[in-house]
Structures are given as C-alpha cells and as structure tokens.
C-alpha cells in the first residue's frame, strides 16, 4: 500500500488547498488540464503531448488496473502530474506489472488524490486552463505563489527536444493482437515514409505499419532538403508529422523546414501538432482554446461522409477558420464546431486535429491511415 503524504496546491487564479500525494515527492509546476476518458489512464499519462501539464481525471477512481509493460505510448511518463478524486492502490488486473503509485515514483511524476475533481473541472471550464504549483515540501501559500510567479508561461516553453527521438530508427511494431496479447508486424510493405517525431505516440506509429508502410522515425531537427532529396531518389514516398506537446508557434525551425516540404509534391499526413504546424507553415497561425480537448470520447462530424465519429483528443490549440481559403475542411468538432481536419487544395497533404489511432479510443477514424498509404503508393 502507498503511504499518502500531504500535498499543497496553488493555482494561478489564487485557489489554494491541501490534498494527498501518492506519487513522487517534491515541488512541481505545470499547466492544469482535464481529461474525460473513462479508461486508458496509462496511455494518457505516457502521451508525450501532456509534457508540462497536470492532468485532472474526471473518472472518479483511478489505479485499480495498475500499469503494464505494453500499453505505454512512450518509454516514460510524460506529464508533470496527475490529479484524482480517489486513488485505488489495490491492483486487480491480470496484465498489471506494478501499481500506478510505484510507476509515478519511478518516473518522477506527482500523483495527487483526495481532490474534488468535479468542482475543479467546472472551474477550468469556466476560467480556462491555467498554471499551478503542487508540493509535498512547501506548505505556505505565499511561498507557492512566489514560486509560481517565477515560472515562464507554458506557451513560451519548447518541450519538443525532451520528447523527440535523438537518433533515427525504424519502427517495426504493428497494432496490438488481443488473441496473443502482443504487438504484430507487417511483412508486406507498400511504401516507405519518414515520421518526424515531435513526441509521437507508439500506437500512431503502429497504425502506419499496419497499413503497409515502412516507418523510419527521425528527430524533430530534420532537414527538409535531405527528405526531398530522398523522395526524388525514390527512397521514401511520404512524410508523417506526429503529435507533440506545447504551443506550435514556438517551433520556428520546424516550421521553416515544413515550409520547404509543402512546396514539393511529397505526400504529407499530419496529426494533432503536425496538423497545427502544417497550418502555420501555410501562413495560418493557430490560436489557443479556453480549456482544450482532452479525452477519448469526443464526437466529430466527417463532413465528407456525414458520419459522426467518436475520437480521442489531446490538444489546447486549434487552426483558424481562415484556413478554408486554401484547404477543404473535412471534419468538425461537435462540442464547439472547431476544425478537426483539412485537406489542402491541389496538394497531396491532409491533416487531422484528433488522434485516429484509437488507443484508447474507438476505431472509426483508422481509414485516415489507409488514405495516407494510398497517397504514398501513387
């Protein structure tokens, strides 16, 4: 059983209260957002897009299925901390390898419980996502306030260097086979693509492999000239721009390289941050949502088929309506009508804001990976 310690929380709006800590000790600062997923907390916590953030889970009890060695979206926990109503340290799942508390401590992630998360989420929907500080060491409100005031705004921080791969590698895993409880492989590749890693989720790369694409993952500090040279030589047939954390507007070097890519005829598919970077590279800067979209139960409408799809989402930024000048809007969010997908006119480029890889969300949006594979095989 985890020994709970006292934790003190201070928010940018002045809210201060005491809770309990079941994760790593220390003082942690980050932006607080909320996630409405009913399951899949391990995938959420290990999603690199949550770098620099505290995640408030709307699900009232978390922890009973523990943590296993297969479901992580990246090699380590990515968020700053998690905030729960109730943490259950009694693990009851045949795949579990360790408790959530043990996992968080190993990865230096704060775990906070004993919080009225319903009220906290209502505050965030009213006032918006904000910065907060939490500590098991500092107990005084004035000290926490002073420490938080010295923290730079999250929109000024570049998290990509921390979560991107340092060296190129070939990703070989395909989607998870529940009959054998193992990741499969794809022996028949139709084309080869480079996946630019801004904090790519494992299951997104798995989906690319599953549709017959050989996937070479490369660092965020890529060279557009090198990619285009390989494309012209027939070595690769497409580019994938991954998801990732933070404000896309701070990624100046990456945007400049993408500007070169979009001047060519190389097929490009972007998800989440990749979707936003394509918009900026085309001259349409993103804007920040009040409290973002975080969860595996967000409905969107496919404007091409008329179908409603339930999607997994994790983003605080959105592309502007003016993108319609150069792209066809393909998907819209049914919660707030924001843009969820675009297809650029007269170019083999398309992108979506949501996460179509369906882990832990549903499978309806997987056709997007098949569309990308078809573009690369032309």
From Swiss-Prot:
Q: What class of enzyme is it?
A: ligase
Which keywords annotate this record?
A: Amino-acid biosynthesis, Arginine biosynthesis, ATP-binding, Glutamine amidotransferase, Ligase, Nucleotide-binding, Pyrimidine biosynthesis
Q: Where is the Glutamine amidotransferase type-1 domain?
A: 192-378
Task: Quickly give the catalysed reaction.
Answer: hydrogencarbonate + L-glutamine + 2 ATP + H2O = carbamoyl phosphate + L-glutamate + 2 ADP + phosphate + 2 H(+)
InterPro entries per record? Anth_synth/Amidotransfase, CarbamoylP_synth_ssu, CarbamoylP_synth_ssu_N, CarbP_synth_ssu_N_sf, Class_I_gatase-like, CPSase_GATase1, GATASE
The ranges of region (CPSase) come to 1-188
GO biological process, any: L-arginine biosynthetic process
PROSITE patterns membership? GATASE_TYPE_1
Q: What is its EC number?
A: 6.3.5.5
This protein's superkingdom? Bacteria
Provide the binding site for L-glutamine: 49, 244, 246, 273, 276, 314, 317
One GO term in the molecular function aspect is:
glutaminase activity
Instruction: List the catalytic residues.
Output: 272, 355, 357
Q: One short Pfam family name for this protein?
A: GATase
Say yes or no: keyword tRNA processing present.
no
Q: In which pathway does it act?
A: Amino-acid biosynthesis; L-arginine biosynthesis; carbamoyl phosphate from bicarbonate: step 1/1; Pyrimidine metabolism; UMP biosynthesis via de novo pathway; (S)-dihydroorotate from bicarbonate: step 1/3
Q: What's this protein's family per the entry? A: Belongs to the CarA family.
Self-association or partners: how does it assemble?
Answer: Composed of two chains; the small (or glutamine) chain promotes the hydrolysis of glutamine to ammonia, which is used by the large (or ammonia) chain to synthesize carbamoyl phosphate. Tetramer of heterodimers (alpha,beta)4.
Question: What role does it play?
Answer: Small subunit of the glutamine-dependent carbamoyl phosphate synthetase (CPSase). CPSase catalyzes the formation of carbamoyl phosphate from the ammonia moiety of glutamine, carbonate, and phosphate donated by ATP, constituting the first step of 2 biosynthetic pathways, one leading to arginine and/or urea and the other to pyrimidine nucleotides. The small subunit (glutamine amidotransferase) binds and cleaves glutamine to supply the large subunit with the substrate ammonia.
| Name this protein carries in UniProt | Carbamoyl phosphate synthase small chain
């Amino acid at each position: 059983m985890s020994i709970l310690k006292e934790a003190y929380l201070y928010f940018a709006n002045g809210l201060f209260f005491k809770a309990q800590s079941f994760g790593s000790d220390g003082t942690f600062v980050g932006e607080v957002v909320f996630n409405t997923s009913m399951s899949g907390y391990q995938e959420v916590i290990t999603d690199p897009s949550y770098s620099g953030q505290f995640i408030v889970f709307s699900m009232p009890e978390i922890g009973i299925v523990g943590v296993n060695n297969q479901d992580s979206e990246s090699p380590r926990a990515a968020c700053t901390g998690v905030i729960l109503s109730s943490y259950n340290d009694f693990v009851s799942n045949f795949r579990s390898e360790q408790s959530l508390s043990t996992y968080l401590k190993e990865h230096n992630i704060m775990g906070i419980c004993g919080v009225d998360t319903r009220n906290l989420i209502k505050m965030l929907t009213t006032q918006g996502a904000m910065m907060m500080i939490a500590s098991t060491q500092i107990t005084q409100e004035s000290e926490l306030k002073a420490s938080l005031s010295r923290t730079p705004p999250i929109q000024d921080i570049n998290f990509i260097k921390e979560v991107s791969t340092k060296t190129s590698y070939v990703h070989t895993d395909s989607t998870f086979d529940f009959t054998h409880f193992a990741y499969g492989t794809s022996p028949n590749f139709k084309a080869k693509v480079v996946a630019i890693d801004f904090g790519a989720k494992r299951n997104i790369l798995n989906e690319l492999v599953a549709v017959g694409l050989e996937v070479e993952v490369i660092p965020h500090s890529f060279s557009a000239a090198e990619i285009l040279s390989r494309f012209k030589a027939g070595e690769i047939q497409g580019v994938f721009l991954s998801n990732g954390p933070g404000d896309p507007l701070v990624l100046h070097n990456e945007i400049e390289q993408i500007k070169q890519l979009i001047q060519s005829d190389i097929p490009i598919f972007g998800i989440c941050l990749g979707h936003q970077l394509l918009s900026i590279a085309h001259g349409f800067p993103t804007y920040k949502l009040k409290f973002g979209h975080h969860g595996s139960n967000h409905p969107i409408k496919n404007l091409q088929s008329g179908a409603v799809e339930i999607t997994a989402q994790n983003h605080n930024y959105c592309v502007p309506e003016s993108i319609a000048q150069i792209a066809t809007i393909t998907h819209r969010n049914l919660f707030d009508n924001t843009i969820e997908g675009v297809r650029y006119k007269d170019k083999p480029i398309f992108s979506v804001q949501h996460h179509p890889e369906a882990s832990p969300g549903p499978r309806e949006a997987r056709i997007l990976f098949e569309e990308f594979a078809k573009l690369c095989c032309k």
